[in-house]
Amino acid sequence: MKNKLKAYIIHENEEWLIPLRKALEKFDVQYEEWLLDDMTINIDQSPPNGIFFSRMSASNYTRNHLHSNQSSNIILTWLENHNRRVINGTNVLKIEFSKVLQQLLLKQSGFKTPKTIVAVGINKIKEAASNLNVYPMIIKPNQGGKGFGVKLINTINELDEMLEDNLINSSKDDTWLLQEKISTNEEFITRMEFIGGNFIYSLKVFSKNSFELCPADACEVDLDQFCPVDEINDINNSQPSFFIDDDPDKNLAKQLTIFLKKHQIEVAGVEFIRNKDGVPIFYDINTNTNYNLNAEKESKVNKNGME
């Protein structure tokens, strides 16, 4: 009997791996975890044989993993140089770590994105805001996740106060995006999930009290204003924050499938909001995607992201 290849899970957040571990053990998959931050590596050696799955997250530095960018890029490059099978490799890592790159790639493929001005250096934020000159606007760090550092700016005076009081969160690469806040008639954003390059399901996320978004069971949060959308109406507290759409936009899913394949992205969640004209505006690509078990259980779709 032919030996099964061992799976290697490359990550920097133990908490997010809990459901993946359960799924791997359920299917009797032999696996090993590589937690990447500070490290040493002998690049003259060959890596082990196996399948390598990168679960690196752009929010790594918010957990004080300050060297995850460098270590993950080195490890994935080393693996690819030895022709190992890597899921979400170095090309995808660049996309995960840069919201500017995400916006550029989406625009290049014809997807609508928010009006955006990029500021490199905190001293350029006010100039970028003046150039955008659309209020309210959103400021977010180029590398980020779970809404870290995303803030709403209603006026230029409000921005002045934020800068004066050091209320703009630092960015790992000293780069920020200033984006228009999209007007919408919807009470939710949409996140389309893809695994193996295939569309799995579409998740509606109702926002309440935060810019944070993490659909995983490990980080159930209240949501509001976390993406570049206008203020929306409160929803009934009895409704779940996350639920799976029984009637997803299949044409849009097909377009995104082509886009992800073009950029070698095998696992991802892509987020958008529809403006008042019903046009989807894309603002985020999550290549370290997680899944909400409660939403999956309550859905008629009968699909489990981890399995």
Residue ranges and their predicted role:
Residues 57-60, 142-144, 288:
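Short glycine-rich anion-binding loops that position phosphate/pyrophosphate groups of nucleotides
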Residues 2-7:
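Extreme N-terminal starter segment of soluble prokaryotic enzymes
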Residues 51-55, 138, 177:
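Structural motif
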Residues 137, 200-201, 268, 281-283:
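Protein kinase-like catalytic core scaffold
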Residues 12-118, 127:
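Conserved N-proximal alpha/beta basic substrate-recognition cap immediately N-terminal to
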